[in-house]
Structure formats: structure tokens, C-alpha cells
Amino acid sequence: MNQSLTLAFLIAAGIGLVVQNTLMVRITQTSSTILIAMLLNSLVGIVLFVSILWFKQGMAGFGELVSSVRWWTLIPGLLGSFFVFASISGYQNVGAATTIAVLVASQLIGGLMLDIFRSHGVPLRALFGPICGAILLVVGAWLVARRSF
């Protein structure tokens, strides 16, 4: 996939996330628990991915799925569910902009730390730009979020 298409997908996913969370908040407003919205979200994804796996690989795909399960392979699903829960809660309690600002800033810091940890021997000079960018993003997130906390 070329860089332009990747950028377009990332932008579409970012906008889609705002729409998704807004709709999920609406579901929680007509439900007794946030779990209804989360389960509907997961159910749609499961049906979609099961259908694609069946279409592409048939029963062999399900055999591979079962053989791929390890205890640690369940962690991304738990973290994804936590992310969805935190996002919906954030939209409900502090609004979309604050939620997005805090999530993006914390993701950038975590990603930058991971990149620094993985990049053995990278000169400090090469990290100056990314670190300054992260600081500016955190300051921007604080400016957006300070009214909510």
C-alpha cells in the first residue's frame, strides 16, 4: 500500500472513530448499560470477520484460528475492549475533543517511548524533532482538556 493511500485510510479511520463513538454513546443513552453498545460493536466485528475468514479460507481458516490461540493472544482484545469503554466514557463525561486529545497524546507518548526503546543507538539529535512534537501535542491536549478536569 502506498503512503498516500495509507494516509487516506488513517484519516478516514480517525473520522470514523468519532462517528463510531458518537453512535455508541447514543446507544448507551437508550440502554441500561454501556455493555450493550460494546457488545453490539463486538458482534458486528465478529460477524464481519468470521464471514471474511469463511469466504477466504473456509474451514481451514477456523482450524488455524483455533491453533493460534495462546493466553497472550487474548490481551489485544482485552485492551481493545478497554479502549472502546474508555472512549465511550470519555465522550459521555468530558466530550469528544477532550477524549480525543487525551487519547492521541497518550498514544503518541507510548508510541514514541516504544520507538525509542526499539531504536538502539539512535543519536539524541535524531530524537529532538519527535520529542519536541510530542511535547507540543501534550501541551495542545492539555489546552483542550483543561476545561474538563
UniProtKB/Swiss-Prot annotation:
Entry's Gene Ontology BP terms: bacterial-type flagellum-dependent swarming motility; inorganic cation import across plasma membrane
Record-given protein name: Inner membrane protein YdcZ
One Pfam family here: DMT_YdcZ
Cytoplasmic topological domain: 26-33, 92-93, 145-149
Subcellular location: Cell inner membrane
Lipid bilayer topology: Multi-pass membrane protein
GO cellular component, one term: plasma membrane
Periplasmic topological intervals: 1-4, 55-70, 115-123
Keyword NADP included in the entry's annotation: no
Keywords for the protein's UniProt record, in alphabetical order: Cell inner membrane, Cell membrane, Membrane, Transmembrane, Transmembrane helix
InterPro entries reported in the protein's UniProt record: YdcZ
Residue stretches spanning the membrane: 5-25, 34-54, 71-91, 94-114, 124-144
